[in-house]
A protein has these predicted regions:
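Bacterial lipoprotein signal-peptidase II cleavage site
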Residues: 23-27
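Major-groove DNA-contacting interfaces characterized by cationic-aromatic clusters
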Residues: 70, 436
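Concave beta-strand-loop units of leucine-rich repeat
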Residues: 29-43, 49-65, 74-108, 112, ...
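C-terminal motif of bacterial Sec signal peptides marking the signal peptidase cleavage site
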Residues: 18-21
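Bacterial N-terminal signal peptides that target proteins for export
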Residues: 1-9
């Protein structure tokens, strides 16, 4: 029995010794620092066996996405790495880079800069990138300052260059390559194209090409146009009583193309058709093309006139006034054969319209005159409908005496700015007159033919006269504007023979 116990004890000792031999030490547990040039994410995943890893040196590795992912998932490990840019390796927290031309390509540069989150300045001396390529960099990195220089005309110039002299070059020498370089100078504000002797190697079409490329730069340039010296700085260009004709339009267009400061281009009686000039004006709205229109032999005005006063005209004769889009005051009254005011459609600024004693039948063209304040339709017996005036919400005064065809004035009730409505001799029912007084409490509605002093017709109290029998101030102002006391009509001051 004693022998069996001894054997059991021996076996137990042997088992204990065997068990102690199974607890072999793991050397990976001792790894706290590690250096590796990783090829990909898989190589970094293998590092997970080092559970006690504290520092990891990955300099020389190019798998930046994998490195950044590893850092995010292993905050306990201090990782050191670098980023290869144009053949040189930089710490990922680098703030400034200076890259020599020829050491980088745009796509590779854009890709690698994603891994430089603290980069704030990029220096590119003598860069070979184009303006469009530089714009791509700025678009992808809007907070990045990009400074660069370019080689231009044998010199190295900075992107902040503001002035350049091209007067010594020919138009042919300003080729596409040079144009691309110029486009890389966003701060360029002045380009000299005139030599000291006042000559230039550039034609207007060449200047236009430069302006298209450098929209923010002023071109210092002058040229001859129909015997007149014109400069790109001119704000006004005027030609008067000079035969230019329709054939001169291409030259005029070439000039307007390079006159960015011109706000007034006058072609007064230059033998150019109205339709041609209207198209020119439409194509160059900023230049305000102005010309003279003629009608019925004795009348003529510039197209930018604000006042027109003429009488005894026909509708077809004043059709030419459609080119006068700035008219504010229009008197075409006392015209027995005037049957349309279609022309006012083209006068959006019109405030006063006088078409008394005419055969007009339709007021709808006034729909395009939202600023209309005064309307005189005295003795316009063919008018029947006032509804188009509903759109003229700024109307203050209407004289419709002897407009016998009008029997309904209810469309006027909505015109809350009305101050005077003179009905005079008319076919408006008495009940409607009273209703108008109620519906338009702020308007002086008058249907009297004459006042107690015997003042006659449209001079009656309630229109041109105040209650005291004196001329109203608004009418005195209009007399001056239309120059009634001078018996003025448009074109009277200056007799001009129209060039054709």
């Amino acid at each position: 029995m004693k022998r069996i116990s001894s054997v059991l004890l021996s076996l137990m000792l042997i088992a204990a010794l065997l068990l102690c031999g199974c607890e072999k030490h793991d050397p990976n547990l001792d790894v706290v620092d590690y250096t590796l040039v990783a090829a990909d994410a898989a190589a970094l995943q293998e590092l997970d066996i080092y559970v006690n890893l504290q520092t990891l040196d990955l300099r020389g590795s190019d798998c930046y996405d994998a490195i950044e992912s590893y850092i995010a998932s292993h905050p306990q490990v201090k990782v050191t790495y670098d980023v290869a840019v144009a053949g040189t390796r930089y710490a990922p927290d680098v703030q400034q880079l200076k890259l020599e031309d020829g050491t980088y390509e745009l796509e590779a540069l854009l890709d690698v800069m994603k891994h430089l989150p603290k980069l704030d300045t990029l220096e590119l001396p003598k860069t070979g990138l184009t303006a469009d390529q530089l714009a791509v960099i700025r678009e992808n990195f809007p907070n990045l300052t990009v400074n660069y220089t370019v080689e231009l005309l044998g010199q190295e110039v900075g992107f902040d260059l503001t002035e350049i002299d091209l007067s010594g070059l020919t138009a042919e020498e300003v080729d596409e390559a040079l144009m691309e370089k110029l486009q890389m100078l966003p701060n360029l504000t002045n380009v000299q194209l005139m030599a000291e002797d006042g000559t230039s190697n550039f034609a207007p079409v060449d200047v236009k090409r430069l302006m298209d490329v450098l929209p923010g730069a002023a071109m210092n340039y002058s040229f001859e146009l129909f015997g007149k010296t014109v400069t790109t700085a001119d704000e006004r260009v005027e030609f008067k009583n000079q035969m230019i004709g329709n054939d001169g339009i291409p030259e005029i267009r070439a000039a307007l193309d390079i006159l960015p400061n011109c706000t007034y281009f006058l072609l007064d009686n230059c033998g150019i058709d109205n339709e041609v000039l209207a198209e020119l004006r439409e194509d160059y709205p900023d230049a305000k093309v102005v010309w003279r229109v003629f009608w019925k032999k004795k009348y003529h005005v510039l197209t930018d006139t604000e006042m027109i006063n003429c009488n005894g005209v026909r509708s077809e004769e004043i059709e030419v006034l459609k080119y006068c889009n700035d008219v504010v005051y229009l008197d075409i009254g006392h015209s027995d054969y005037l049957d349309s005011i279609e022309v006012v459609k083209y006068m959006p600024k019109l405030k006063v319209c006088i078409c008394v004693d005419s055969k007009i039948t339709d007021l709808s063209p006034l729909v395009n005159c939202p600023d209309l304040e005064v309307l005189e339709i005295v003795y316009c017996r063919k008018l029947t409908d006032l509804s188009p005036l509903v759109n003229c919400t700024k109307l203050k005064g209407i004289n419709m005496s002897m407009a016998y065809g009008i029997k309904d004035i209810t469309p006027l009730y909505s015109l809350q700015n009305m101050e005077r409505l003179y009905l005079g001799s008319n076919n408006i029912p008495e009940e409607m007159y009273k209703e108008a007084c109620e519906k338009m409490p702020n308007c002086w509605v008058s249907n009297s033919w004459s006042d107690s002093s015997g003042v006659y017709r449209n001079y009656a109290v309630g229109w041109r006269l105040d209650r005291g029998g004196t001329f109203s101030q608004w009418y005195l102002d209009l007399r001056q504007i239309f120059r009634y006391t001078e018996y003025y009509y448009s074109g009277k001051e200056e007799r001009i023979t129209q060039l054709k």
